[in-house]
Structures are given as structure tokens and as C-alpha cells.
């Protein structure tokens, strides 16, 4: 299994709005299309106004297929219209668990 970490720096003062919209609209759509929903976090200390999502996939090919389907969904495009102006920067990393990681 591979894990995708998506880190979004949200514009100042917009974090609560982003989290609410994501919970109501984005997450249900992602659960419909993507792999395993692992976790969703906001930052409390250090670099603030971040949300971090973790998703698990069987492989990079699985991730690519699922994300293509989601991007083609008109409802996903509507969701993006709601949140794009709230996001400052987005980064994505693929994480591979080591043999002794509790997440495999």
C-alpha cells in the first residue's frame, strides 16, 4: 500500500470555512472515488492554517485511476469552485511504509 499526504495551507482567517466545506462536500465525494481515508488533521502549533489529509491506495496506478475518475466528476468540479479561493498553497507527497510501520 502507498499513502498520499496532501497538505493545504489555507488563507488566514479561512481555515474554519475550508474545514466545514470539505467535511460537507469534499470528503463525501472523495470517499466515493478514492482509496482508504486514513486521517485528516489541522495544525495547532508551528506553521498554522494547514490541513493535512492522508489517503491509502493499493498502488500508484490505483491512485491514478481513482483520481482521474474523481476529477471527471462534475460534483468534484463544483466543490473545487467552492474552495479554490480559500487555498494558498498545496503540496502532495507519496509515502511508502517501512517494514515495521503499523500502517502497511
Language-model features and meaning:
Residues 22, 67, 80:
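Short, flexible helix/strand-to-coil boundary loops that buttress conserved ligand/catalytic motifs
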Residues 2-6, 18, 50-54:
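Short, structured motif recognition centered on aromatic/hydrophobic residues
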Residues 14-39:
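Short amphipathic alpha-helical segments
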Residues 24, 70-73:
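Short, conserved loop/turn and helix-capping segments at secondary-structure boundaries
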Residues 16-18, 59-71:
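Short amphipathic alpha-helices within nucleic acid-binding modules
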Residues 3, 27, 60-64, 79, ...:
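Short alpha-helical segments used as structural interaction elements across diverse proteins
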Residues 11, 36-52, 58, 77-104:
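Glycine-rich beta-strand-turn "strand-cap" elements at beta-sheet edges
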Residues 29, 74-75:
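A common structural junction motif
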Amino acid at each position: 500500500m502507498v499513502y498520499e499526504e496532501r497538505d493545504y495551507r489555507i488563507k488566514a482567517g479561512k481555515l474554519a470555512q475550508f474545514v466545514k466545506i470539505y467535511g460537507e462536500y469534499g470528503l463525501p465525494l472523495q470517499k466515493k472515488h478514492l482509496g482508504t481515508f486514513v486521517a485528516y488533521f489541522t495544525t495547532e502549533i508551528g506553521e498554522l492554517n494547514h490541513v493535512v489529509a492522508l489517503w491509502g491506495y493499493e498502488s500508484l496506478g490505483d491512485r491514478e485511476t481513482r483520481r482521474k475518475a474523481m476529477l471527471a466528476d462534475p460534483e468534484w468540479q463544483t466543490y473545487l469552485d467552492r474552495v479554490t479561493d480559500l487555498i494558498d498553497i498545496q503540496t502532495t507527497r507519496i509515502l511508502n511504509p517501512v517494514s515495521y510501520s503499523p500502517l502497511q
